[in-house]
Each structure stands twice: as structure tokens, then as C-alpha cells.
């Protein structure tokens, strides 16, 4: 069924939607409420309807980033397709959907509240990035302190990775990278 992911930036709303679509083996459409209009919504719904004529598969997933930015008519355009199961809607928002999403659409969606990432989550993300990123895993990186890194990331995975990229990029050549509070705050 359709749902809305509500939480601060960088907590994984978009990533979760991709994981859901991939694990369910569903066709996946993405729209950004910032740059899409009613015409774009109708095109995706029409594609989903025509694809369903030729397959007996499950309904595709339509992910709408920043769904709170859609106006009433844009949200109205989704109603029929969500209600009849033509699409499964996954909306992502940083704003309270009770105030930003129209009641008829909200009543057809489960709302999941996501919280800012905790220090342990950020540490896991940092460890994984250092081990699996194609550039980082080939650099000599010594993580001495993480307080400033985690404080500046403020529970946001995207910020953490951006700060990490800036810090590592400040060390030119084959110089070993030292991540400590001073380096993070001076970059």
C-alpha cells in the first residue's frame, strides 16, 4: 500500500524508497515535486496503466520527493491512481504531512516518521564509507576524533558524507588523511 516517509533531510527517505522498489521487484518512477506538474503525474499514471495492460505484474511505485511542495491540484491528480491501485505512491517530505498533504490522499497512505540519525548510525555510515567507497578505500585515512564530524553532520547522512569528502579532499596527493576535530572545523 502507499505510504509517506516524513523526516528531516539526510535520513534515507529516498534510499528507503529505492530499497522497497528493488526488494519488491517493482517498476520505479521518480518525480520531484519541485520540478514536476500535473502533466508529469498524468504521464507516469498513463504509463503505469498501459504497462499493466501488457503484464500481470504488481503496480509500479511512484516516488515523489518533497510531496509537500505539490499543490492541491497536483495531489488531486494522484488520487484515482492510488485508490484503484494503478500505482503505489511513496511520498517523501520534511514537513508534517497532516498539514501539507490533502486529506483524501493522506487517508490512503500510511505515514512513517523517520528521525535524525544517531551517533551510532553516523559511525556505521562512516565506517562503511571508508571501507567500500572506491576512492576512500584506497587512501590512508586515520580517524582520530569524530565529535566535530558528527556535530556538523547533525544527524544527516548526506552532510556527513559531504564533510568527509571535503576533509579528505583537503589532503593533496598521497599524504595520509587525519580526521580529527581540528581538521573538520578548519575545512
Residue ranges and their predicted role:
Residues 1-31, 46-49, 79-80, 84:
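Walker A/P-loop
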Residues 170-187:
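Conserved C-terminal helix/linker of AAA+ ATPases
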Residues 28-61, 72:
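Short glycine-rich substrate-engagement loop in P-loop NTPases that contacts/grips substrate
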Residues 32-34, 110-123:
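Conserved AAA+ ATPase "SRH/arginine-finger" region at the nucleotide-binding site
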Residues 31, 63, 88-92, 113:
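Structural recognition of the conserved hydrophobic beta-strand(s) that form the central parallel beta-sheet
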Residues 126-146:
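Helix-loop-helix "sensor" segment of P-loop NTPases
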Residues 79-80, 96-110, 127:
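Short regulatory helix/loop adjacent to the ATP-binding pocket of P-loop NTPases
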Residues 147-152, 158-173:
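C-terminal helical "lid" of AAA+/P-loop NTPase domains
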